[in-house]
Amino acid sequence: MKEFWQILKRYVAPYKKYVAGSVVMNILSAVFNVFSFSLLIPILQILFNVGEHTYEFIPWHRGMPFNEITNNAYYYISQFIEVYGPSRILLALCLIFCVIVLIKTSCYFGAAAVMVPIRTGVVKDMRMEIYDKILSLPLGFFSQERKGDIIARISGDVQEVENSITSTIEMLIKNPILIIIYLTVLFRMSWELTLFTIVFAPAMIGVMSAIARKLKAQSIEAQRYWSDTMSQVEETLGGLRIIKAFLAEKKMSDRFDAVTEAMRSKNNRVAIRQASAHPVSELLGSVMIAIVLWFGGTLILGEHSVIDAPSFMAYMAILYSIIQPIKDLSRAAYGIPKGLASMERINVILDAENNIAEPAEPRSLSSFEQSIELRNVSFSYESGREVLHDVSLTIPKGRNIAIVGASGAGKSTLVDLIPRFYDPTDGSILIDGVDIREVSTRDLRALIGNVNQDPILFNDTIFNNIAFGVEGATMEQVVAAAKIANAHDFIIEKPEGYDTNIGDRGVMLSGGQRQRISIARAILKNPPILILDEATASLDTESERMVQDALDYLMSQRTTISIAHRLSTVRKADEIIVMNEGRIVERGRHDELIALGGYYRKLYEMQTL
């Protein structure tokens, strides 16, 4: 339960006023519920003409408050009966009973209503915390986690926390209040009978706790299967073209069926165990009622009766009212472990360490004036495999640098170090003589623009995709950027122009159009440093020409670092950096490297065959 209280402290604390309101409403509801049951005693006495006892008024503050209230209430009722007759008083008591029940149910509704903002607020806060954490984590974290698993945690696991934990908050606020108030009244009515009843409470709690512990372990396993399901759905949506091309529908369907069947089997066991909460608590409660009926009957039938029949019936009515709060607590005891299991999976994200640490006192870097310098940079992934080894490189401002090499040479890793998507294992990277680890990532990345081989667009309008990351961009600025990127003409041909939604990942556009939107976005940002990842590699000839024209304009006014897969595109580079197995093996202009007859020439000749 320690973990549960930590969750409440973490997420429910901002909603203290709602919790306080719920507590007040539940107390009022319980008090008026006791009043409604207390009215049963005089009603039963009138109906069955029971109780020859004569009540005398006790001055206030002369005895125990409970005794004063009870005695004087019966005194006034007996006086009214003498004056108005039992029939009229019975009608009055029944009307009062209805009014009390109306007040009680209104308080009950109020208690439930003030809990709604807590439930919805906790879920919203939790999702925002996970989402913000995802945005802050380095790229290395996501290379180790499946996207489907992350989606499952932000959707299914958070939903399970809502169903299993936040839904129990109301039970945990309301039911202890009801139980405490009811028990207090029961002790005042007959402490012997109540003490006898409490003896059975530890047995009920022990049975429910044993089932709850087993339920948590099974819930963790069930949520893992849910993650596997979401991961396969994500893979299927991303690879649908390949699945159809290779006639793999049946194979993927069988794989999905196996995962969902395993999840169904595990969920069956969890649901069956959770379903046992109600009948188990019902059985234990009924056994307790039966035993209390027997013991209470002996108290009434004994020579020295400590409770009369109408009071005993009211006692049993209140006691039976405790059964429902106890059953609710038992459901909470079964539900909380499921939520804790999901919370453990959520905490894998929330507690993940961000190794791209922000400096405590960041140095200012608002512009780029001199050079980018890599000093003896080495880098290894967490697996231990070294990707870069002792790389040193200086890129003066305004230079166009191309990085080439075979697949796996470390080209992409090298450029990912500059915006601090990763930090080098050894060595340092400096911009204008300032170590980039001493600069806030926000200031650093504001200086850098990216155009990737596979343009990353969002399910939004063309305008919003171009203006992405540029606060307050105007239509005039967006149009100007689109014209430079050779994108304006095809945009205005769309039915809604710049307000056209381009679909998921820009599926409504061609490859060349997507790339030109990506270039327009970089132009609008207008960064002094540009990183290109072979932006024309997958385009047809016409699209490549238009994209290359846009890139030429973009590159002419800034420092450019481009990864080149096709060596024919690097002829204009001021310097070509040739990499092999994580090291710089050659550098120079195209003609110089060809004349050198080394590794670059070998790569070039392989592509021109």
Please identify what each model-predicted range represents.
Residues 185-199, 273-344, 349-350:
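Helix-loop-helix
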Residues 358-359, 365-609:
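ABC-type nucleotide-binding domain
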Residues 48-52, 120, 128-152, 156-158, ...:
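Short intracellular "coupling" helices and adjacent cytoplasmic loop segments at the cytosolic face
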Residues 21-28, 170-221, 294-307, 324:
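Transmembrane helices of ABC transporter permease
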Residues 13-17, 139-140, 156-165, 169, ...:
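An intracellular "coupling" helix at the cytosolic face of ABC transporter transmembrane type-1 domains
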